[in-house]
């Protein structure tokens, strides 16, 4: 018992130290828009555009890629070894939702709007339109995944019914031995459970990875080192909680808790955001001058929609659902956790 308590305390201390370090890094300095005169910062000139794609900035993005990979993977496999406190996961997920929401509206949308103002005199709300596009694309992906899940479930039920009919017909035509009947009765339900669990796990990973790729692109197209670190803090906070929740869900969906399958699924989820970072780096490296500014403005607009959808529909509305009653599972506590996340981003944006 004492050993278990020591492990819990040490794990919580590690989590607190990690979040504190990321918060300090996020507050150490930021790029972005200026005081609101409609002019774009460094990326507006060719000389500064070459600086944006400097080796130092790329190195920072690579570090962000590695950090996301390592900590997300560690969070995904951690439930196999350690039982997390459900109240901590519940409120932590809501806090991450507030950080996501604040980042989308106060950082991504502001940067996209400011950059568009410096690129064109057209008064059309490009950034807000792209936000709607990003939101709807993410919603469409969820609908497609849900449709595939329903179809797979329906196919499993129909196959089960057909199999039962065949068994009844065979029973009428021939007399099976008692051992064969028991084997047939036991084998099929077990296979159905394993199949449905496997399909649910795959769909869960696909949904999480799709969103994570677009989140990683936000880091890859960052215009400065400080902006890359800030995006890492925002996305990493969400990814760690999501990875832990995913690991817990996988262990519940896979009856025998195979360590190898947990590692494979966690690695797939961990790789998704670094893939997005790599895509963002490639986009940023291949675009120059005004093309780079257009790419950045469009990417930030789309990322705003993705972040808003994930924050509202995945984290706030669904979030982490504890499997045992907990005192923290109350609307007021959830609201305060989201409020704290938004407040943290509001304070961080003072130094933007």
Swiss-Prot record:
Stretches in topological domain Cytoplasmic: 78-87, 149-200, 252-262, 318-330
Residues of the signal peptide: 1-29
Extracellular compartment spans: 30-56, 109-127, 222-230, 284-296, 352
One GO location term (cellular component): plasma membrane
Keyword Signal part of the UniProt annotation: yes
Cited InterPro entries: ZIP (IPR003689)
Compartment list: Cell membrane
The entry's keywords: Cell membrane, Ion transport, Membrane, Signal, Transmembrane, Transmembrane helix, Transport, Zinc, Zinc transport
Tissue spec. comment: Expressed in vascular bundles of roots and leaves.
Induction entry: By zinc deficiency in roots and shoots.
Membrane topology, as annotated: Multi-pass membrane protein
Main location: membrane
GO BP annotations listed: zinc ion transmembrane transport; zinc ion transport
Record field: transmembrane: 57-77, 88-108, 128-148, 201-221, 231-251, 263-283, 297-317, 331-351
Pfam family membership, one: Zip
Molecular function via GO: zinc ion transmembrane transporter activity
Family: Belongs to the ZIP transporter (TC 2.A.5) family.
Function, in words: Zinc transporter that may mediate zinc uptake from the rhizosphere. May also transport other divalent cations.
Name of the protein this chain belongs to: Zinc transporter 1
Organism annotation: Oryza sativa subsp. japonica (Rice)
